Amino acid sequence: MKYTIDELDKMEGHKFEYAVADLLRHNGYREVQVTQASNDYGIDILARRKNVKYAIQCKRYTGHVGNKAVQEAGLGMDFYHCDAAAVITNSSYTKQAVKLAETTGVRLWDRSFLISLSQNYKDDEYERPVRRPVERNLKIADVPEND
């Protein structure tokens, strides 16, 4: 199912996780699975793209995502023996979260990335996406001063 950003914004946490898993699956990620709700070590989705295994934390927020999500994603990556960690949100990140992600290597997938996943959604999950979702490396300079 293709999702609009407005639909994603209104979803409850667990439903949002399943929607993100579906979006990833239909954008070329493989072996996509939603982890158990409890004892997930901060990781909501495990997925593979090319030869990289991702540990992904989902945050459906109305505010900015902070340090805690970045810390949990990094720890969860180690627990699940993944190659990379990411936090995906329908929102944005605090400066502190961006700074921590820069030093730990956790990838921050923001609202723009989520929208690109939705726009590139292919009905047949085995088709290649129209365009590869653009993953930006967020830097402190990308975060407005009032955050």
Tell what function each PLM region has.
Residues 1-147:
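Mixed-charge (Asp/Glu-Lys/Arg
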